[in-house]
Amino acid sequence: MKWLSRILTVIVTMSMACGALIFNRRHQLKAKTLNFNHKALTIIIPARNEEKRIGHLLHSIIQQQVPVDVIVMNDGSTDETACVARSYGATVVDVVDDADGKWYGKSHACYQGVTHACTNRIAFVDADVTFLRKDAVEALINQYQLQGEKGLLSVQPYHITKRFYEGFSAIFNLMTVVGMNVFSTLDDGRTNQHAFGPVTLTNKEDYYATGGHKSANRHIIEGFALGSAYTSQSLPVTVYEGFPFVAFRMYQEGFQSLQEGWTKHLSTGAGGTKPKIMAAIVLWLFGSIASILGLCLSLKYRQMSVGKMLTVYLSYTTQFIYLHRRVGQFSNLLMVCHPLLFMFFTKIFIQSWKQTHRYGVVEWKGRQYSISKEQ
């Protein structure tokens, strides 16, 4: 069995080498004090039954050091979303129904929201987002100014978890970031065509020139379509990590909501990662199973060193925790038991593949969307 021990050790070593390459570029926001005597930008928040989340976002917006306008686009909410938004001084606009069924997801609400914006700079922010610092909006604007106030800037918020089950989002969040390609030196450095969806910043001129969310009207996950639309007009598209400025808490409704949400994401957003980066990601993830397999076999067969296999497992675990700490705050127990996270990720991936290729339909927030119709 020593030969098997050597093979598994080599596999995990190769896996960790891939792990060192998939997220070895950092793209972080930089803070800078800015002075505005007028509204710095308009924040548009698409919201559907978000009464339990939107208050945290609006409270954090009130704390910002620069003045902003806030528009909440109420997309058919049946709860107290509108009342909560008004209590924080936000302007609430009811989304006009999409009678023809031409729009998917939140794009319809976002596109309508721009017509109510009174500033040239516009930011689209999901209701489950929170600004962690009082200079968060300044950091966003500063970074946008550094790219000439042109194109599209997007941010993947730092993922904060409070309940144990929320930690099962860990691998998905890491894959969301590294799957953007630009965070790895394996990327060929060509123009980025993808954007994160939770926080995006642009200007009206570029937004209308590219078609804005109209270009994503058939996409549940609008970031890729938006990024492609801007790139086609030779406009810059940039992506950044949220920490320490922007965070979110996902799927507070329960474990079922978490499963449905990530099934939706994988159904529509797995095709943008470049092949060599995807290969490195797959090999890195496989290291989770290889490391636990080696440890379990060493406990059964004396020919395999328990100490060696435990060292291999702990080495992989250390890297696993290190990479995930960049994108979120997750349970230490789940981080150590990463094979469970890998198996859950695999389960959702298979479920997503079935919905996409067998049924062609995905459900989210009480609405069904046909994947086959996405352009």
Curated annotation (Swiss-Prot):
Keywords: Carotenoid biosynthesis, Cell membrane, Glycosyltransferase, Membrane, Transferase, Transmembrane, Transmembrane helix. Its main location: membrane. The keyword Transmembrane helix applies. The keyword Transmembrane applies. It is found in: Cell membrane. Pathway: Carotenoid biosynthesis; staphyloxanthin biosynthesis; staphyloxanthin from farnesyl diphosphate: step 4/5. Its EC number is 2.4.1.-. It comes from the Bacteria. It is a multi-pass membrane protein. One of its GO terms (cellular component) is plasma membrane. The chain crosses the membrane at residues 3-23, 164-184, 277-297, 330-350. GO terms for molecular function: glycosyltransferase activity. Pfam families: Glycos_transf_2. GO terms for biological process: carotenoid biosynthetic process. InterPro entries: Glyco_trans_2-like (IPR001173), Nucleotide-diphossugar_trans (IPR029044). Catalyzes the glycosylation of 4,4'-diaponeurosporenoate, i.e. the esterification of glucose at the C1'' position with the carboxyl group of 4,4'-diaponeurosporenic acid, to form glycosyl-4,4'-diaponeurosporenoate. This is a step in the biosynthesis of staphyloxanthin, an orange pigment present in most staphylococci strains. PANTHER family: GLYCOSYLTRANSFERASE, GLYCOSYLTRANSFERASE 2-LIKE DOMAIN-CONTAINING PROTEIN. Belongs to the glycosyltransferase 2 family. CrtQ subfamily. This is 4,4'-diaponeurosporenoate glycosyltransferase. It comes from Staphylococcus aureus (strain MRSA252).
